[in-house]
Regions:
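Short S/T/G/P-rich N-terminal loop/turn motif that feeds into the first structured element of a domain
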Residues: 2-89, 93-206, 210-239
Length: 239
């Protein structure tokens, strides 16, 4: 059976944030989250979904996903968090020897209607794969239909765990052309084996051909499929 698809539409506002730590500062950044930020998020009505770092972390990155009841709640929670004296104290203490971050990226997301229920889960040791697709013009709907009708079930058939699927909110610059999702695998090698068998599946081949025939070409841009393997952090609710 497929994982429980949310019975009702998940109307929460999600935010995926990517932090780039200054050289030598990633451990300090993670300590600040572990000791302070995660708890303070909860205090201010922010739901922690998951925290990860790339397995090959050349850019000193932290990737995390949080959730809010609504976009309005999002703005209110961030404002209150930023003004919290406990946060200000923790931030100052952590930056005594210099700033921890060089860059922050953020995208506001909605759950797709075919995403499994977005809630933290912990399983046997596993690796995560963050995949981002950029579609050709006008084809985000077709890409979602292909996932809804075929891909999600085929991923499971070939040993992958479907976790979360999102598209950017309407006011985000990638709203018309991006799908972001997270899978889990037993290992990076298992992921490779799963994708090899998935791509050779006649059901997938037929679904891909039919969707591309309907669109008059590929649903994704050249170089429009990005994949990054992640490992969950010790303080991540999803691990």
């Amino acid at each position: 059976a497929l994982p429980s698809i949310a019975a009702e539409k998940d109307t929460r506002s999600f935010e995926m944030r990517t932090y780039y730590a200054a050289p030598g500062k990633l451990d300090d950044l993670l300590a600040r989250f572990r000791d302070h930020t995660v708890k303070l998020f909860e205090k201010h009505g922010i739901t922690n979904i998951g925290y990860w770092v790339p397995i090959e972390n050349k850019d000193n990155k932290l990737v995390y996903v949080i959730a809010f009841p609504s976009r309005e709640a999002q703005a209110k929670s961030w404002k209150e968090f930023g003004a919290d004296p406990d946060w200000q104290t923790a931030r100052k203490a952590s930056e005594k020897k210099g700033k921890l971050l060089t860059k922050v990226e953020s995208v506001f997301l909605n759950a797709t209607d075919f995403s499994p229920a977005i809630k933290p889960s912990a399983a046997a040791p596993r690796v995560f794969e963050l995949r981002t697709y950029t579609t050709t013009p006008g084809n985000l709907g077709r890409l979602q239909a292909r996932f809804r009708d075929h891909t999600v079930a085929l991923f499971q058939k070939h040993g992958m765990t479907n976790l979360f699927y999102w598209i950017p909110m309407a006011d985000q610059k990638t709203a018309d052309n991006m799908l972001v999702y997270l899978l889990a695998h037993a290992s990076a090698d298992a992921a490779k084996a799963s994708f090899t068998s998935f791509r050779g599946d006649p059901v997938w081949v037929a679904a891909k051909e039919a969707s591309e025939k309907d669109a008059g070409g590929s649903l994704t841009t050249p170089d429009g499929v990005k994949s990054e393997f992640l490992k969950a952090l010790d303080f991540s609710p999803t691990k």
